[in-house]
């Protein structure tokens, strides 16, 4: 597996930001938004997940929390009642919006789009339980699920220390240049593209507050959480240029969600 190329040194140079994004289909930014920015949100998610019986109590918001013994998500994970409750409670809390709207992220996105940014384009919080590799997000392109503008970008943020064995995000560099690929599969969030050689994906151990920006056509996946008892916590925020319309038609003319 390849290593992510860090672009954090270039975030103040819009031309380099756009050049790297066009070449790689992603931007890995270590320290952006940074650990302090995500502590309140991480604490919130841990508290809600604890109340739902998914996590053990913890006092260290930067360390990957421990799973509650016997906790597991049913079905595809996305249709588990506790997962849905987690989304409802977390996404409605100002601490979730505060991270997605922080200046550190929006500055990069404004450079990327060369203009104003539209937020709230499909945000979600995630937790990856151990012993649940069957629920690991398969390789896919976000455009398959969202449709709309080809300039939709996702920002994936690690909320705790996330070594490779905890299952961080992996991206396929340059895959955005191949257009929309065929997706297949059954169940919510389970449609994906044909498996690509794992060695072609890029990933890296991440610290709390590290972010990976990627285009809606960039093939990406989660790596499996192969730890014994730790839970990966992360969030996705999605953005597009404010001057482009919102719709769900894919580039091939089909409609997302159908």
Each model region followed by its residue ranges:
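Short hydrophobic-aromatic micro-motifs
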Residues: 27-29, 155, 212-214
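Catalytic core of non-heme Fe(II) oxygenases with the double-stranded beta-helix
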Residues: 107-110, 133-203, 244-254
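Active-site rim elements
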Residues: 93-98, 197-202, 222-223
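Non-heme Fe(II)/2-oxoglutarate
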Residues: 2-7, 42, 51-61, 72, ...
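Short, solvent-exposed loop/turn segments at secondary-structure junctions
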Residues: 33-35, 125-127, 144, 162-164, ...
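Non-heme Fe(II)-dependent double-stranded beta-helix
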Residues: 1-23, 30-139, 145-146
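A structural signal for short, well-ordered beta-strand segments
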Residues: 122-123, 155-157, 235-239
């Amino acid at each position: 597996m390849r290593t992510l190329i860090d672009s954090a040194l270039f975030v103040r140079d819009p031309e380099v930001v756009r050049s790297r994004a066009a070449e790689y289909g992603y931007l890995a930014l270590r320290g952006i938004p940074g650990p302090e920015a995500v502590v309140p949100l991480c604490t919130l998610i841990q508290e809600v997940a604890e109340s739902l019986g998914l996590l053990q109590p913890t006092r260290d918001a930067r360390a990957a929390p421990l799973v509650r013994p016997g906790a597991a998500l049913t079905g595809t994970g996305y249709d588990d009642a506790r997962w849905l409750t987690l989304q409802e409670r977390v996404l409605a809390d100002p601490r979730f919006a505060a991270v997605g709207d922080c200046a550190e992220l929006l500055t990069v996105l404004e450079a990327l789009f060369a203009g104003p940014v539209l937020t709230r384009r499909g945000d979600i919080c995630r937790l990856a339980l151990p012993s649940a590799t069957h629920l690991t997000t398969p390789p896919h392109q976000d455009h398959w699920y969202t449709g709309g503008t080809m300039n939709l970008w996702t920002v994936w943020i690690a909320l705790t220390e996330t070594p490779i064995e905890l299952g961080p995000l992996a991206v396929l560099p340059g895959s955005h240049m191949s257009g929309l690929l065929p997706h297949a599969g059954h169940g919510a969030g389970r449609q994906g593209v044909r498996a690509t050689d794992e060695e072609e994906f890029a990933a890296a151990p991440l610290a709390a507050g590290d972010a990976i920006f990627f285009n809606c056509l960039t093939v990406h996946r989660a790596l499996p959480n192969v730890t014994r008892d730790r839970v990966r916590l992360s969030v996705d925020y999605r953005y597009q240029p404010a001057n482009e319309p919102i719709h769900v038609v894919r580039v091939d003319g089909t409609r997302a969600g159908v």
